[in-house]
């Protein structure tokens, strides 16, 4: 039977709850404030999983909506998870977006990580001050190198997970062969709400970049 165990701290749209058990406490971590500039993380704890829960005195434990952090290039921080690494260190993984020229953001929500320590009262503190930055001076975990994607795509193999479609693609409209990506047109446009138009692309990852491609039009133009 569903049971309400915590209403949050009063921020709108409380969501994304996670419960962790640590040292006899059940910690309930949630997101509040919506997914734009008011996004934040709050936490409460209880000795029993079904409560009652008492919120942390320094909530929100992660937020960038305050006046002191409005110039931070990372905004909309939230939707977080706490992770303990193999060496015993604690980290917070969250979603946020990078801004350019104040309020402009077009890269979508990206994944960020920040160190966490537990204070003398057994509450988590994110990066020492409840904020994250593009560069943080922290001990790093061992590097796990991965093969970087080539800057140029020769269409000599099937499209990988980097490529995106709108809604569920009609796979028959796309063909990768002979060093080319062949796309067949469709009646659906980009504003189609139900079906998928003939479109494929990949997400913009930087504010400034250059991209080139060679296009050959078929008989239909």
Q: What residue ranges belong to the model's regions?
A:
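Carbohydrate-active catalytic/glycan-binding domains of CAZyme proteins
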Residues: 1-221
């Amino acid at each position: 039977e569903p049971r309400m165990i915590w209403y949050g701290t009063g921020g709108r749209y409380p969501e994304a709850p996670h419960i962790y058990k640590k040292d006899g406490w059940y910690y309930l971590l949630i997101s509040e404030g919506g997914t734009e500039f008011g996004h934040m993380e709050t936490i409460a704890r209880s000795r029993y999983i079904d409560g009652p829960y008492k919120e942390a005195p320094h909530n929100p434990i992660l937020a960038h909506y305050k006046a002191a952090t409005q110039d931070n290039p990372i905004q909309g921080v939230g939707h977080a998870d706490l992770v303990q690494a193999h060496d015993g260190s604690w980290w917070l993984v969250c979603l946020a977006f990078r801004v350019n020229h104040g309020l402009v953001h077009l890269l979508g929500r990206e994944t960020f990580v920040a160190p966490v320590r537990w204070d003398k009262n057994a509450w988590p503190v994110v990066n020492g001050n409840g904020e994250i930055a593009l560069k943080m001076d922290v001990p790093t975990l061992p590097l796990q190198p991965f093969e970087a994607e080539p800057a140029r795509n020769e269409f000599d193999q099937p499209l990988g997970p980097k490529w995106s479609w709108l809604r569920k693609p009609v796979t028959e409209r796309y063909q990768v062969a002979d060093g080319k990506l062949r796309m067949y047109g469709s009646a659906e446009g980009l504003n189609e709400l139900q079906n998928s138009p003939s479109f494929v692309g990949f997400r913009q990852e930087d504010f400034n970049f250059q991209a080139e491609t060679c296009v050959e039009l078929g008989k239909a133009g």
